Amino acid sequence: MFKHSEYNLLETKKFIELTKSAMLNTEDFEKWNSIKAMFGIYTERNRGTYMLRPRFPAGLLNIEELEYFVNICEIYGEGRVHLTTRQDIQIHGLSIQKLIIVLELLLEKGYSSRSAGGHATRAIMTPPMSGFEEEIFDVTPYGDAITSFILENPDYMGLPRKYKIALSNNEENSLTAKISDLGLLAVEVNGIKGFKVYGAGGLGANPKESIVLKQFLPKEDFLYAVEALKNLFIEHGDRENKARARIRFILQKFGRDEFIRLFEEHLNEVYRTKSLKVFLEDKKEFLEEDIEVESIPNLFNGRIKGRYAYYLHPTNGDLSIKEAKILIEGLKKIPYNLELRISNTQGLFIRNLKGSSIEEFKNLVKDFSKNELENSIACAGSTVCNLGILDSPDMLRTILNHFKDKKELSDHLPKLRISGCPNSCSAHH
């Protein structure tokens, strides 16, 4: 479990106290309502309820943590555990009274939803197979370090707009890094490991692929890039026009060469004024070899022969309480440690499976997706999201039901990405 700092937990506690007073005082409610999104809280459409999004850095959690959140969703939520497209779990259907209870329960366990939404630095994306597959190096610790850094620095909240950062462990997993505000792609040049730095990308209205800001950055210098682009964003971001407030519009305004010059200028200033080098060890875990198994849908090889990862994808990212409890009890019976990683595709990677467990495991996950079509992604849609135009989850369910008994056809169909508005939460671009 990621360990939040005392400062971040204290700020979370202050917000909970404000939430309590907001129920009683109009002025406090207005203040609370203006900042609640930065604490991962959004109003649900026509319901009088809220959605809460706690942070799960790198999507990491263990079986006990998953069970804890399932219980919270069962008692206080609406009977489902929603896996998101940014490696988090969302709890839906919370009244303001239940929201306060859940916030306090999560704080007691050391969780925080701070900076999980709004005009803030969002969840740091890391590949869910990083540390398990062949790669330049495991970028997970770097994502955790960025998370710790931004949550210790208040100026990473209250930005002109959201600031999205993604890391990639190799070129094959580089897509997310190339469509983010800041992307850090692990590379090796002349035997030295570091990051290729991308910036000013994004989906939604006016989608744009990132540009290369720096061909090579020593891997211990990653926080300098994070800080430099944030400072550029604060200086040049448009706080008047929300529709043009993302970093990619700064690029559009100044052009490629000038934007890169501005980034270099800010980068040099951060190098001059701050000490942000972080040296992290590459961890290579060597495990005993196990038996190999034949390829099955959603099963992936790891870099250790005989170790596997399974991608579990519930429809629309929604695990029912019943499904989740059956899954948890089954995972508990596996007599060795498993690693769980929430993906950015509304799914869950179950890592470190031994070949000897696969047959039993297949029975446990038999009711989940078995092909690319069933791995499709749909955003929250118009029944929940205030911005939604289309009921995208229902559309996906209708499509999947149509092909339910047509396996000879559906096995050859691609994954769909359905967004209920132009914001591209399903990454349909």
Identify what each model region corresponds to.
Residues 97-98, 107-109, 234-296, 352, ...:
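Terminal amphipathic helices with adjacent charged low-complexity linkers/tails
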Residues 41-46, 77-83, 235-240, 299-304, ...:
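Short, flexible, solvent-exposed loop/turn segments with mixed acidic/basic and small polar residues
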Residues 21-27, 49-194, 224, 310, ...:
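Small-residue-enriched alpha-helical segments and adjacent helix-cap loops
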Residues 2-4, 157-261, 429:
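Mobile "lid/hinge" segments at catalytic clefts and subdomain interfaces of large enzymes
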Residues 265-346:
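Acidic, glycine-rich loop-and-beta core segments that form the ion-binding/anion-interacting portion
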Residues 35-41, 68-78, 199, 231-234, ...:
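Short amphipathic beta-strand starts and helix->beta connectors
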Residues 5-6, 12-20, 35, 146, ...:
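Generic structural signal of hydrophobic/aromatic residues within well-ordered alpha-helices
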Residues 1-65, 173, 181-184, 190-191, ...:
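N-terminal basic/disordered segments at the start of proteins
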